[in-house]
C-alpha cells in the first residue's frame, strides 16, 4: 500500500533519556494534528521498548535501525528480528549505506535480514543508492537495480508489497554535492519502472519510495511534490523536533 511517509533515522545518537525526551517532544508536537503522512522514528536498539511505550504508536511508528541475519542463538551482541518485534517496534531499517560501507553487508546478508523481518511481522525500510564514483560513471541505475534484485527479487509479489524502499544518493551526503528534486524524481521513476518489469504495474504503483539524501525543511516540499517521491528518510534533521516537524508538514 503506497503511503506518504516521513521516517527519522537517529543513527548512533541520543542516550536513552535524550531519546525519550525527543520522542515525547515529537509526540506532543503532533497532538491535535493530522499530518498528511505516516510518521516513523528509527531509534537505537536500547531505546525501542521505552520509546514504543512512551508515545502514541498509532501516530508515530517505531523502527529499529538494523536486525541480525540469524534467527537466534550463539551470536553474541546481535539483536534478532523477533527481539525487535517484541519491543513494540513495527519497522526495521535495512541496507542503509552506512551498514553496507562500514559493516560490509552484502545483498545476500540483506536478503536474509529482509526475510527474517517479514517472518516476524516487521516492515522493512530497505535502503538502496549509489556512491559518487558510480554516479559519475553513469552506473547509478545499474547499481540500484542490482541492489534491489540481489536482496528483494526472490520475494513473492505479496511479500514485496510489504517493503518500503528508501533511495539514498550516497554521493550527495556530506560531499557538498546535492541531488536536485529532478534527479531524485528521475531515479525514483526508474526504480518504479524496474519494479514494474519484475512484478507488474500494480505492485510498482503501490510501492512507497522514500528519498534519503539530506532532506530538510528547505527542500522537502519540492522533493515531496514529485510524483514518484513518497516521502523521506531523514537523518540529522530528525534529531530535533523543530527541524523534523516542518518536513512532516511539507506534505
From Swiss-Prot:
Protein name as catalogued: Triosephosphate isomerase
Compartment(s) = Cytoplasm
Could you say which EC number(s) this protein's record lists?
5.3.1.1
Lineage, please? Bacteria, Pseudomonadati, Bacteroidota, Bacteroidia, Bacteroidales
Sequence intervals crossing the membrane: none
Provide GO CC annotations from the record: cytosol
Q: Which organism is it from?
A: Parabacteroides distasonis (strain ATCC 8503 / DSM 20701 / CIP 104284 / JCM 5825 / NCTC 11152)
Look up the record and give one Gene Ontology term from the biological process aspect: glycerol catabolic process
Question: Which residues are the active-site ones?
Answer: 96 (electrophile), 168 (proton acceptor)
Pathway of action: Carbohydrate biosynthesis; gluconeogenesis; Carbohydrate degradation; glycolysis; D-glyceraldehyde 3-phosphate from glycerone phosphate: step 1/1
Annotated gene: tpiA
Which reaction is catalysed here? Answer: D-glyceraldehyde 3-phosphate = dihydroxyacetone phosphate
Amino acid at each position: 500500500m503506497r503511503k506518504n511517509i516521513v521516517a527519522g533515522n537517529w543513527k548512533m545518537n541520543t542516550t536513552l533519556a535524550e531519546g525519550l525526551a525527543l520522542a515525547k517532544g515529537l509526540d506532543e508536537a503532533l497532538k491535535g494534528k493530522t499530518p498528511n503522512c505516516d510518521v516513523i522514528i528509527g531509534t537505537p536498539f536500547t531505546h525501542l521498548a521505552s520509546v514504543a511505550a512512551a508515545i502514541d504508536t498509532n501516530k508515530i511508528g517505531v523502527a529499529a535501525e538494523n536486525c541480525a541475519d540469524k534467527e537466534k542463538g550463539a551470536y553474541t551482541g546481535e539483536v534478532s528480528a523477533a527481539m525487535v518485534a517484541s519491543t513494540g517496534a513495527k519497522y526495521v531499517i535495512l541496507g542503509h549505506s552506512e551498514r553496507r560501507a562500514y559493516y560490509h553487508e552484502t545483498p545476500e546478508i540483506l536478503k536474509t535480514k529482509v526475510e527474517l523481518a517479514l517472518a516476524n511481522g516487521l516492515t522493512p525500510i530497505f535502503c538502496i543508492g549509489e556512491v559518487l564514483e558510480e554516479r559519475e560513471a553513469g552506473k547509478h541505475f545499474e547499481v540500484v537495480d542490482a541492489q534491489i534484485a540481489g536482496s528483494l527479487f526472490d520475494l513473492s509479489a505479496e511479500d514485496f508489497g510489504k517493503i518500503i524502499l528508501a533511495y539514498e544518493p550516497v554521493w550527495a551526503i556530506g560531499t557538498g554535492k546535492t541531488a536536485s528534486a529532478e534527479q531524485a524524481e528521475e531515479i525514483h521513476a526508474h526504480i518504479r519502472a524496474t519494479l514494474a518489469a519484475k512484478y507488474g504495474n500494480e505492485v510498482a504503483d503501490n510501492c512507497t519510495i522514500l528519498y534519503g539524501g539530506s532532506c530538510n525543511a528547505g527542500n522537502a516540499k519540492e522533493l515531496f511534490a514529485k510524483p514518484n517521491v513518497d516521502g523521506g528518510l531523514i537523518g540529522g534533521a530528525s534529531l530535533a523536533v523543530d527541524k523534523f516537524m516542518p518536513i512532516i508538514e511539507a506534505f
